[in-house]
Amino acid sequence: MPPDFWERCFWLWGLLLWLSVGSTGDAPPTPQTNCTDFQNANLLRGTNLKVQFLLFTPLDPSCGQLVEESSDIQNSGFNATLGTKLVIHGFRALGTKPSWIDRFIDALLRAADANVIAVDWVYGSTAAYFSAVENVIKLGLEISRFLRKLLALGVSESSIHIIGISLGAHVGGMVGHFYNGQLGQITGLDPAGPEYTRASLEERLDPGDALFVEAIHTDTDNLGIRIPVGHVDYFINGGQDQPGCPTSIYAGYSYLICDHMRAVHLYISALENSCPLVAFPCTNYKDFLAGQCLDCFNPFLLSCPRIGLVEQGGVKIEPLPKEVKVYLLTTSMAPYCVHHSLVEFHLQEPRNKDTCITVTFLSSSVTSSVKITIPRHQRVGKGVLAHPSPQCQINQVKLKLQASHRVWKKDQTTIIGRFCTAPLPVNDNKKMVCLPEPVNLQASETVSHDLKITCI
């Protein structure tokens, strides 16, 4: 965690305290008859746990039915033959309803024929973060008691899917721990880092908490946890500094929260859109960008994990491996998904210095670039290039040899080599497409070539 993390938190906490005076944040929609909305807690009196379980069903997706007792559940639209998804929010600094929750619930109900239960613990998650942390075990016990009522109605443990956001991810882990890891699935959306990075397995989310546990990491250098906590752990853009998020503290609250909340918006986008958010296992982000991890054979036997409501994230092996780090790149806005391509340049002759080449793909309206380096005394340099359009819709590739920094004269270096590319995953060489002729590159000059790849 950066040394200035708490300093930034306290600075922004003062801003939040000032904003909270006379403010309730996002105005909640006018509730329908017999519908219940999230509570709004007072910022200075929000530490007492006061939980609501709000049921949303395909028959009435915009109406939250308050279900507390078994009779409430039986008299509601709850269908015990369907799967059940519990959504647990995290720390609420201002004591308001999460601004994203309505869209999240709607996306879940559109994507799956299921019961959706939102766990409202705005009371108990407000004011000091550390007070909210102290409520995690108590909340986990309350949710466990509630699930017992569902199980009594014939719901199976394996049909329960908990989706926890930030601190809510560890609440979900606590519930799963109470059920000895027999719940169907837990999805952690940027599980909280403060107070949990060094916590024991019993205190935080871990692979033993459900039959399948996945986590999406987007803010590992601030509010999110930096260690793997699931069977599959997605590190989006390396797990930090998400494209499109502010990089200056002067952006205020958005600077603190944007990376952290990107996990939520990514998951919503995966539910709402058909373009896949596919990831690739790798030891670390640097190796992934360098084109060292091109398929999903190890450890997934070619079944690449995918974000969304896909059984076991698309992983089709048993037993499931644990704490596997997988990586993917995204765009700066919804639907976020990109296509990943391996790009390679093969020198005819090795050089006694590093060779840097910028590779740019051009489609009808978008350009995407990456720099690859060929180490000295070697012939091949490669990297991963992310682009919104499928590779078969790329019209041109541009190549530019980066000039050496010479003050006294122009760099007139010329190299000759072969350019090749293939869409990920690269399971064999059959996908590799190379330009038909060797390419001559002169320092600082851009060379363009048509790229003709057939859509399959």
UniProtKB/Swiss-Prot annotation:
GO cellular component annotations of the record: extracellular space
Database matches in SUPFAM superfamilies: alpha/beta-Hydrolases
Top class in the EC scheme: hydrolase
Localisation: Secreted
EC number: 3.1.1.111
GO molecular function: phospholipase A1 activity
Protein name per Swiss-Prot or TrEMBL: Phospholipase A1 member A
